[in-house]
A protein has these predicted regions:
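Membrane-interface helix-boundary motifs at transmembrane edges
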Residues: 6-10, 73-84, 149-160, 223-237, ...
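Aromatic-anchored segments of alpha-helical transmembrane domains
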Residues: 22-29, 167-180, 242-257, 318, ...
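Interfacial loop-to-helix transition and helix-capping segments at the boundaries
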Residues: 48-58, 124-137, 178-214, 249-286
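Hydrophobic cores of alpha-helical transmembrane segments in multi-pass inner/ER membrane proteins
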Residues: 58-67, 133-145, 209-222, 281-291, ...
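Hydrophobic alpha-helical segments with transmembrane-like composition
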Residues: 104-109, 117-183, 198-217, 222, ...
């Protein structure tokens, strides 16, 4: 049996990847501007709306990872071959960017041994930059996928309804896990077990277990693509209403925690990913953006669909690059609007410039890689022709 099955392409995945990438860049642009003294109450509310609307990014990326893997691999998955491919596709692009961030952002000195130790720790933990934690987290899912896929094939229900029942049970367990996050952290700190202690304490935010439900939801969508789509369409009004209600509630909670005197201080700490309230909202967010993506595929102009699909195709390397680009695009935005200019306008400008710049860098790197590959092929062919002529 083939370990990877050729199936019809899930067209909305390209749109979803592009949307998730844009949402990540927007979140990080907001993170730079909201603490600044020039950010007023109106900016805080508007940026809060944008932040809430874009929080789907990480759970959607995890969902798409689960959906892509379980959709693509039906048969036996040879572990070493699978991991080798993931090292090539995920780790290989990650390493040079992590090195760049370690030197540029963390000022790691590689001329002494302690610098190399710091670099090694950063590579394994994703600490070289604020966005690289996701790569470390998602690679854990790749490491466990082959045995997990074999287990799921044996135990999963054969009907969509039964599978959704299991997913509902997993969601309940996930809410309990989110509720117990603090207890897990304190226990790990108290026990101080080597490796496992930091994994469940200092690095709990990049522990794949804390995101397992979104991966499971992606698996369900992969097993029953057509039923999944039909289910979302059937319940779209209920899902969209629940999403809107939760978004309004979260905005109320966030704004209620703004400090107004003696000066305005904007706070978004209520929007952390790992708590039960946000787990409910993020699940609704993934469902909502999937509904939007399906409608987008049906009704958006062709040129817009192509742009979003193009962003999706280059989203991983663009994701790796965007933090570096954002650092400089923030300066461009500040020069356009002034240091005392609208925080909202500067945020949106930095977001647009950074998303475009990171995507273009990813595109240029892929073109360069293809050109180098072609040059090597030509040289190899020429060498073979010379050998044959001798």
């Amino acid at each position: 049996m083939k370990n990877k099955t050729r199936k019809p392409r899930i067209s909305e995945l390209d749109t979803l990847r592009g949307a998730a990438f844009l949402a990540v860049v927007l979140q990080h642009a907001i993170a730079h501007y909201f603490p600044l003294p020039a950010t007023g109450l109106g900016d805080g509310v508007l940026l809060g709306v944008l932040l809430i609307a874009s929080k789907f990014a990480v759970p959607l990326f995890v969902f798409m990872t689960g959906m892509s893997l379980f959709y693509s691999y039906d048969g036996e998955v040879p572990y070493l071959n699978f991991i080798r491919k993931r090292l090539k596709d995920i780790a290989l692009p990650y390493l040079p960017w992590a090195l760049l961030y370690a030197i540029e952002f963390q000022h790691v000195q590689l001329l002494d041994s302690s610098g190399w130790q710091k670099l090694g720790l950063m590579l394994f933990t994703g600490k070289a930059s604020y966005h690289l934690w996701y790569v470390v987290m998602v690679f854990q899912l790749y490491l466990i996928f082959p045995p997990l896929q074999r287990l799921v094939k044996r135990v999963r229900p054969r009907s969509f309804a039964a599978t959704m029942g299991v997913l509902a049970l997993l969601f309940g367990l996930y809410l309990i896990l989110m509720e117990q996050g603090g207890a897990i952290y304190r226990t790990a700190v108290a026990w101080d077990v080597p490796v496992l202690g930091p994994y469940f304490a200092k690095y709990l935010d990049r522990n794949a277990l804390m995101y397992f439900f979104y991966f499971a939801m992606g698996a369900v969508a992969a097993f029953y693509v057509e039923q999944w789509r039909a289910w979302l369409i059937r319940l779209r009004y209920a899902i969209l209403t629940a999403f809107a209600g939760m978004a309004i509630y979260l905005l109320y909670v966030v704004v209620a925690h703004f400090q107004l005197t003696p000066q305005v201080v904007i706070r978004y700490h209520d929007l952390g990913l790992l708590n039960p309230r946000m787990a409910v909202f993020l699940t609704l967010s993934v469902l909502t953006i999937y509904i939007v993506a399906m409608q987008w595929e049906q009704g958006a102009p062709g040129w817009l669909r192509k742009i979003m699909a193009w962003l999706g195709a280059y989203s991983y390397v663009a994701y790796l690059a965007h933090a570096y680009v954002l650092k400089y695009m923030e300066r461009v935005a500040d020069s356009l609007f002034g240091m005392d200019g609208s925080a909202s306008a500067r945020t949106l400008a930095a977001f647009i410039f950074s998303a475009a710049g990171a995507a273009l860098i990813a595109y240029a790197l892929r073109l360069a890689a293809r050109s180098l590959k072609r040059i090597r092929q030509i040289k190899t062919q020429q060498a073979n022709e010379k050998s044959a002529a001798l």
